[in-house]
Amino acid sequence: MSSSCSGLTRVLVAVATALVSSSSPCPQAWGPPGVQYGQPGRPVMLCCPGVSAGTPVSWFRDGDSRLLQGPDSGLGHRLVLAQVDSPDEGTYVCQTLDGVSGGMVTLKLGFPPARPEVSCQAVDYENFSCTWSPGQVSGLPTRYLTSYRKKTLPGAESQRESPSTGPWPCPQDPLEASRCVVHGAEFWSEYRINVTEVNPLGASTCLLDVRLQSILRPDPPQGLRVESVPGYPRRLHASWTYPASWRRQPHFLLKFRLQYRPAQHPAWSTVEPIGLEEVITDTVAGLPHAVRVSARDFLDAGTWSAWSPEAWGTPSTGLLQDEIPDWSQGHGQQLEAVVAQEDSLAPARPSLQPDPRPLDHRDPLEQVAVLASLGIFSCLGLAVGALALGLWLRLRRSGKEGPQKPGLLAPMIPVEKLPGIPNLQRTPENFS
């Protein structure tokens, strides 16, 4: 999300000019009638209402008989204040030459609008909203003009003014001030938000470029429930639902993170469950626990949501229903076994050690596949060992049968080159 804040666009300049009448010799009323506005340290011109332009009038402060400006000033029905300050605020009265009161004007001082601060957030893949706040307190009545358009690719000048790219008005929320909502946005498109602040002394605009995947922040999960697990003094079962504002679709899922802590413990433990429930296995026995959940897009677009309201739960301290003995039989051994089990399930003091009985979530098919793999590797190992043993026995047996026969392993040295053997020449004398 990038921000580019500058002057007014061409469309907003025309609207702001109609609203801001500071360029007129006698500004029109902006807001309540009979009120004019000025900026501290700047000159201000007041016009006497109810008289025609150029009519000489006298000016007084309301409740003060001292003359501020006489009819011979040459300014007609106008009063010019060179540099106004906070003491100059108040009501001014103008009178014609015949002493008839022409009217009253109230002067209020303030400042032109500064560039507003704008931020946007999307709670799903189709809608997003933008909020803003003034850059500075102007002290004057203020209006906001909001619009948006779809950004085009660089060089696509023909599409810049296309009806398919806007601009369109961003409807302001009547129930929540300083907020407008865009419906039916395209997830992979980039939009430019235009927020213009206008008051009697001027206007200022902020342009904000947004992408839905970067401003996505779901609402917190709803319906969080925390329940004990009967027979397990170290476990709690938490469940929740998707936020109502998230349109759950097969391609747009949420992932969750869960935090929990015992009462009077400030540190949170965090896990990332799969699905809409989680069994906590390392709670502190006998203590209530606070649990909260937040959500995020499954592919990590945007940011994590705010935390849901905390829900509380206390681990179970009783036995499983099917483990409760039949007390009518009165067997001593059964009573001793139950007492021993109660001692193991409900220790005298809370234990911080993990539960030694973990949940078995393994799939039976996975167990069969593991056993089959172990069997195959065992057979291969036995076959390789048997083959190696057979080769070793064969080589040992062939070495005991006699001298080594010429073959691949026989030395490749001529007989006449062996040391200690005379070199016999095949001559007639040798044959005789």
UniProtKB/Swiss-Prot annotation:
Keyword Lipoprotein: no
Protein family: Belongs to the type I cytokine receptor family. Type 3 subfamily.
Annotated compartments: Membrane
Native organism taxonomy: Eukaryota, Metazoa, Chordata, Craniata, Vertebrata
Name of protein: Interleukin-11 receptor subunit alpha-2
Role summary: Receptor for interleukin-11. The receptor systems for IL6, LIF, OSM, CNTF, IL11 and CT1 can utilize IL6ST for initiating signal transmission. The IL11/IL11RA/IL6ST complex may be involved in the control of proliferation and/or differentiation of skeletogenic progenitor or other mesenchymal cells.
Species: Mus musculus (Mouse)
Subunit structure: On ligand binding, forms a multimer complex with IL6ST/gp130.
Keyword RNA-binding belongs to the record: no
Tissue expression remark: Expression restricted to testis, lymph node and thymus. Highest level in testis.
GO molecular function: cytokine receptor activity
PANTHER family, sorted: INTERLEUKIN-27 SUBUNIT BETA (PTHR48483:SF2)
Residue window of motif WSXWS motif: 304-308
Membrane topology, from the record: Single-pass type I membrane protein
Parts of the chain on the Cytoplasmic side: 394-432
Keywords tagged on the record: Disulfide bond, Glycoprotein, Immunoglobulin domain, Membrane, Receptor, Repeat, Signal, Transmembrane, Transmembrane helix
Positions on the Extracellular side per record topology: 24-372
CDD domains, sorted: FN3
SMART domains named in the record: FN3, IG
